[in-house]
């Protein structure tokens, strides 16, 4: 699936291809969500205060799904979810634990692979592959 996604430009994603990606994600029992349930018109990063308002909803999603692992993208989101200062560069391939309703979850901070994070996309891919190979 990864190679097929890499081989398509965003404008070439049609409904059929999107259905394929969603089906593959479902078959592999992956769940994808976003801490921020909104965005700004110009796609600027959201302030911490806005993202923190969505934490309860995210934790409810996690409590329902009960994932084996959680991957967070970028310093900002990783820090908010883990409630401590996180620098992805210092936490590559390391997990932190969070507890939600007496269930513990492994959280792996990973570089945000788009926007300004595009410069670290190779590291993000490397870390995600490592996490999959070692955790799934």
In which residue ranges do the predicted regions lie?
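Short acidic-hydrophobic surface loop/beta-edge motif
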Residues: 91-101
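A polyanion-binding, active-site-adjacent surface
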Residues: 1-90, 104-119, 123, 130-131
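Short, hydrophobic alpha-helical segments
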Residues: 132-136
């Amino acid at each position: 699936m990864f190679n097929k996604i890499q081989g398509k430009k965003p404008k070439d994603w049609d409904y059929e291809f999107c259905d394929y990606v969603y089906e593959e994600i479902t078959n592999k029992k992956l769940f994808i969500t976003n801490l921020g349930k909104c965005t700004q018109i110009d796609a600027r990063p959201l302030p911490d205060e806005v993202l923190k308002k969505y934490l309860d909803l995210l934790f409810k999603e996690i409590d329902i799904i009960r994932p084996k692992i959680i991957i967070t993208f970028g310093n900002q989101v990783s820090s908010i979810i883990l409630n401590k200062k996180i620098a992805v560069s210092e936490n590559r391939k390391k997990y932190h634990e969070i507890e939600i309703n007496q269930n513990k979850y492994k959280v792996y901070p990973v570089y945000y692979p788009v926007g300004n994070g595009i410069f670290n996309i190779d590291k993000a891919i490397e870390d995600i592959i490592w996490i999959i190979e070692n955790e799934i």
